[in-house]
């Protein structure tokens, strides 16, 4: 992604199967607090880690207890990404992040080393017209199913959910496969 670019719309991803899982399962949004407690900018969020590494090394795929119910959805999204991006790669982290109504993700830059090694994507699963994502000086209302690459390690970014409903995004990191992989 170009250093100056803040958002890059990549296409649309079908999130119907993920929404079905979301609606049919009682997901535990409260037990995983690492992200919220480690990074003050995420204090208002709730995270459901599915593929996640608290060391941020992402050298081996670490999956959570809920991975099996999401495995086919993640596999489908990975295949869609390969087609949309026209490149071979793999999802190395995948989480659902809930930003409750009237809450915010504070302005921050993803400064950890992994942020420059992988491409960060957001896909809204649930949202509303008053949820605004800002990267640098550019703000957008991201729509359900849109695939957005976010320049998270070069620009300050934040989110404010001014709506009356929660916002849930897939946040994932994509590793492009190289000949040495």
Predicted regions and their residues:
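Short connector loops at helix/strand junctions that flank enzyme active sites
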Residues: 89-91, 100-102, 116-120, 126-128
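Non-heme Fe(II)/2-oxoglutarate
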Residues: 1-87
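A short beta-strand-loop-beta hairpin characteristic of the jelly-roll/cupin
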Residues: 124-144
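A short hydrophobic beta-strand segment most commonly corresponding to one strand
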Residues: 119-124, 149, 164-180
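Short beta-strand His + acidic residue motifs that chelate non-heme Fe in jelly-roll/DSBH
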Residues: 107-108, 131-133, 150-151, 155-163, ...
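Conserved short histidine dyad/triad with adjacent acidic residue
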Residues: 96-115
